[in-house]
Swiss-Prot record:
GO terms for cellular component: cytoplasm; small ribosomal subunit. Protein S19 forms a complex with S13 that binds strongly to the 16S ribosomal RNA. This is Small ribosomal subunit protein uS19. One of its GO terms (molecular function) is structural constituent of ribosome. Keywords: Ribonucleoprotein, Ribosomal protein, RNA-binding, rRNA-binding. GO terms for biological process: ribosomal small subunit assembly; translation. It comes from Rhizobium leguminosarum bv. trifolii (strain WSM2304). InterPro entries: Ribosomal_uS19, Ribosomal_uS19_bac-type, Ribosomal_uS19_CS, Ribosomal_uS19_SF. Belongs to the universal ribosomal protein uS19 family. It comes from the Bacteria.
Amino acid sequence: MARSVWKGPFVDGYLLKKAEKVREGGRAEVIKIWSRRSTILPQFVGLTFGVYNGSKHIPVSVNEDMVGHKFGEFSPTRTYYGHGADKKAKRK
């Protein structure tokens, strides 16, 4: 189920402060965040966030198409190695 419209998007408070500080400074740096559950807001466009995936920070450059999505969608937590080879074909 989607979040109620009257509640508005969820964003951790520290995330807004960090983004504002980088905007004021005018320097392009990666903002390290652990809040995968936060929604990407329009004021984050153009910034680069390091989203934690459980082992390291994955750099995510925010563009207009990402607004409204969650940060966690762009930082996968699992590595896919593919399905195992066919054991019957291997024996022959």
